Amino acid sequence: MVCAWQLWLSPRPKRSVIASGSHIYSNDDAALFEFLKEDDGRWVVRETHYINNPLVKNGLSGPPLHIHWKQAEYFKVEQGVIGIHKNGKQLRVTKDDGVIEVPAGTRHKFWSHPSNQEDLVFKVWAEPQGLDHSFDEKFIRNLIGYQRDCKMANMAPSVFQLMLICYDCATLATPPFWVPLWLLTSIQYVLAYWIGGHLLGYKPSYSEYYREPGDKKTM
């Protein structure tokens, strides 16, 4: 139970119930996230970034620089052009380039490339899958759901809540320059769990955003 003083220190939006949906939308409907299962059993997300949305046109519909320290991330473009920043190098990727791997521990981000003339559609997933506290459906649903609810409530997202969601799924925000992984993890652990979790009462996951398999009943 969140205390009144915690709400006063760090207000939070009313959470939308999206746990049972097969897809979700990001801020201002800039991007669609579809949760899929491939024939080989892999969990993937198909993202569609709509070219006519201002956030997409300005290259702002993707995430900031970050690291997944447990897993490699993979991208496969189906339509359009994606820009990928990978350890200081910028890639321009289309469906002809096949699957692009971003190894675990690599600073990276992605966006709709300026040369795009159509909606950007791509699949993204992480491996190995099935790890505890890793890049998975829970991570995306909580991260995107929380940011969208903040936008709808005209409220700035809490950096401590964002860090808690991310750290709990082995993901770290990172500056554009190299910083030792041990230092990033130490600082963000304190900000996420000590301040975000213990002091402010945030959780890494909410039942409105995500429910474990087998517990998908309507709320």
Curated annotation (Swiss-Prot):
Probable oxidoreductase; part of the gene cluster that mediates the biosynthesis of virensols and trichoxide, fungal natural products that contain or are derived from a salicylaldehyde core. The pathway begins with the synthesis of the reduced chain in virensol C by the highly reducing polyketide synthase virA via condensation of one acetate and 8 malonate units. VirA has interesting programming rules since the first 2 ketides are fully reduced, the 3 following ketides undergo beta-dehydration, and the last 3 ketides are only reduced to beta-hydroxys to yield the trihydroxy portion. InterPro entries: RmlC-like_jellyroll, RmlC_Cupin_sf. Its EC number is 1.-.-.-. Belongs to the oxidoreductase OpS7 family. Keywords: Oxidoreductase. The keyword RNA-binding does not apply. Pathway: Secondary metabolite biosynthesis. It comes from Hypocrea virens (strain Gv29-8 / FGSC 10586). It is an enzyme of class 1 (oxidoreductase). The keyword Nucleus does not apply. This is Probable oxidoreductase virH. Gene3D superfamilies: Jelly Rolls. It comes from the Eukaryota. One of its GO terms (molecular function) is oxidoreductase activity.
